[in-house]
């Protein structure tokens, strides 16, 4: 199963994904009465914007983390939102099929993108829209470099795909009108936020299972090897329709 997250800390940090999610949401052509899946809803900040775009519709808020889903429920309540804890690597318990799928900052946590896109296609009606953004090729290069300096085996645990490979996988899964592209989003962090941000957002899969002291030492070492308190994000953008 996917790892759980520190949802409360995640919610407090100055994450840029909410603003990026608003942009991705704008790619969906919505009447307001659709049923839309938020695949990787996190704490529900983007889900809330999505629900507000659907005054006569509803949202399926899905995440692999129990604490994230609980935080989303606390934010949104049960008004036109269905909550699911599920693994995007497996067939999804979503029925009937949805009219559209939105996803932000999720796909790069999943190794098997062929299975991911097949599972999404299976719960999306024919003609339904997919709008997504995740980490793409070259994402967080300064962090990956720092990890490699500590131990080469620490690099490459996330799955930052190229636009070309992603387009091919989407088409193989039954998507058409596929558009994929990269753009850079360098994100400076306020003083004092770098290490909490790294621990919660970027290095959570590395520090899972460590003691608090080990976590702090590891995160500090990574941070000390970065040239500046800036996360060098590269985003992979995805737009497509189900055939």
PLM feature spans:
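A short SAM/SAH-binding and catalytic strip from SAM-dependent methyltransferases
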Residues: 100-113
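A short acidic, Gly/Pro-enriched loop at the edge of an enzyme's catalytic core
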Residues: 93-101
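Conserved alpha-helix/loop element of class I SAM-dependent methyltransferases that forms part
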Residues: 15-32
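Helix-to-beta-strand junctions that scaffold the AdoMet/dcAdoMet cofactor pocket
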Residues: 110-111, 124-126
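Conserved catalytic/acceptor-binding region of the Class I
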Residues: 114-115, 129-190, 208-211
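Class I SAM-dependent methyltransferase SAM/SAH-binding core
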Residues: 37-39, 43-91
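C-terminal helical/coil "lid" or tail adjacent to the Rossmann-like core of SAM-dependent
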Residues: 173, 178-229
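Core SAM-dependent methyltransferase catalytic element
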Residues: 236-243
